[in-house]
Amino acid sequence: MLSNMHFLCGGRIVWGEITQTMYRAAGGEEHEPDGLASEMRGMTGVEVSILIHEIPEGGLRAGFRSKGLFDVSRIAVELGGGGHVNASGCYVKGDYEAIKKNLLEISVRHMGE
C-alpha cells in the first residue's frame, strides 16, 4: 500500500487506495491496516492524508486525516459524510473511478481556498 501513494498540491495532500483487487490478493479481508491513514499524515510536508477503499457494491468509503491546519470535514461533508477538523470520512455508492476523481478534485479545491 505505501508504494501506491500519490501526492497532490505540491505534496500537501497524500492519498492512497485499497481496491477490491488488492483485498482479494490479501485474502479477501476488507479492513484498513491499523494506523495507515495516520502514518500517511505523518509524512514530511503532508497536511492531509486520504485513504480510499473501493467497496464491493460499487463506490467507495474514504477516510480523511489532517494535522489540524486544514479542516478535512469540509471535504467529507461535500461528499455526504462528516466528522471533525482532524478526522472525517464518507461513504459514496456509484462508479468507483468517477467518485474517486470527484473526491480528489474536491480535496484539491478545498486545499486551495
Describe each PLM feature range:
Residues 1-79, 83-113:
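Hydrophobic helix-and-loop "lid/oligomerization" segment in the mid-to-C-terminal part
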